[in-house]
Amino acid sequence: MDCFHYPLDTETLLRKKRKLRRELLARNPHPLHKKIAILGGSTTNEVADQLGLFLLQYGIEAEFYQSEYAQYWQDAMFGTPELDDFHPDVIYIHTNWRNLTPLPTTADSEAAIDAMLDEQYAHFETMWQALEQKFACPVIQNNFDRPNFRLMGNRDIWDPHGRSNFISRLNQKFYAYAASHEHFYINDIDYLSADYGLTAWGDAFFWHMYKYAICLDAIPSLANSVANIIKSLYGRNKKALVLDLDNTLWGGIVGDDGVDGLAIGPEVPEGQVYAEFQSYCKALKSIGVILAVDSKNDEANALAGLNHPDGVLRPDDFVAIKANWDPKDLNLKAIASELNLGADSFVFADDNPAERAIVAAQVPGVAVPALDGAENYIKTLDHGGYFEVTALSKEDLKKTELYHQNAERAKAQAAFADYGQYLDSLEMTAAIKGFEPLYIQRIAQLTNKSNQFNLTTLRCSEDDIRAMAGDKNDLCLCGKLVDKFGDNGIVTVVEGRQQGDALDLTLWLMSCRVLKRGMEDAMMDTVVAEAAARGVKTIVGHYYPTAKNAMVREFYAQYDFAKTAEDADGNTEWTLDVAAYTPKHPHMKIER
């Protein structure tokens, strides 16, 4: 379905949306279900239709509530029975500059304009606070685009009487609010309108005829932007960028042209283009995107190219380098296996359309953008929205380092015939704590990013995690794993609710980076010990199958839980007699 990839095929998206929806549902029979409330300052029917399509593309089936035309503020402040009963998971406020009244005139004093600005901001801030108090869910708010006319020409942007100046100042207030409030996100239509072309974006025909805030053809771009935020919130981002080398990271073929013959660096325009792309990839690494190489090349030539004196990327910027003559789809599958990531975690970037087609056909789930001209590589990846950032943790900032440490562990394992001896050699320490304030952001992030080792796929906000931590009936544990190669950070989370002498486990997940290290044993030993100390006699666990978590289908059976229920969808319930549990005593020191 190339219509979803940049550049968007808006004609297909708008005209064939029902067919596309059927095809997307058939392709993903077990989507994540979410309720999205759209509070609009304009007509939003097409916005909801397009947003639904893009979310389905990311494996999220949305149910929508839409306010009546221009009733966004009234619905938020005074409520409606329909919205109250809807219980949204996400609220999207779709407003634009036409919802700003009044706007400055040349007759207004600067003091009056400042008061007007404060009043407009208070109008929105009061609404956001009311929604937070009532629904406690993420809120996505458009910033403001600008009119496609300027009353005073260039003066409009710097004169306080100008609409452009007023909107710019109001946007800054919105950004300050976003910076200081969790679960509040800006959908940047100021950028989208500039990228699309402000004259076409703000075509007044669509406002006066249909009360659409933007032109019809721009709505898919708007919906894609909102969908990128939502899929990021629910762990549907891509995690890794796999790059070809020749004519992708540099101009030329290193095996034929030699390192000196490659176009990279400041000497020629072509080299500048590739250097800029390498800089972009390096910047992606800095926000937690892991980089890998998949190239048909001799490894020595590939490494020589990556060590080019004018290059930006170096071999240690990559967590895996597959430079050989194997099919690229097999290399990509090998990288996925080594990193314990699903294929749908990857973006594959290659200048060769034949190689792209093979990978797209042979590795379902991988994103394969159409790279057309090196000068467009950055734009294509950026507009794809693969790596939308809604939260940035310390673990994200050192993601490449963590994977390099895992590679060192794999090398160390090869020296041992006995796996237990290998685990002992790692000198592991598991620090198992409650949901302490220091860890709240990372815990919430894990609930929204972990898909494979995740028994219930319960997605939680930071406020949800705080509520669990503050409830005396909740058992809340998170685990940090450290060994001689480094600190893995918080890698596992467990939460259960005690009712009498039973503990019901509603959340159990672990990062796949620490699979087969015994961390799950350490957590289970601790859960059972803590439960026993609370007077719990029975622990109840749940497994809810998804397209990605089959690996933990029999997780509880490994710890002598008995399966007590299973429904037609494969949802299972398991129980453990606490008194009968035998501790696993994993190969690590446990700190509490």
Walk through the language-model features, giving the residues of each:
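A conserved beta-strand-loop-helix scaffold within acyl/acetyltransferase catalytic domains
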Residues: A431-S511
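Terminal substrate-recognition subdomain of acyl/acetyltransferases
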Residues: E338, A360, P364-L426, A529-R592
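Substrate-recognition element of Asp-dependent hydrolases with the DxDx(T/V) motif
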Residues: Q272, E276-N307, I321, V359, ...
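Conserved Lys-Pro-Asp/Glu-containing loop-to-beta segment of HAD-superfamily phosphomonoesterases
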Residues: L332-P353, V359
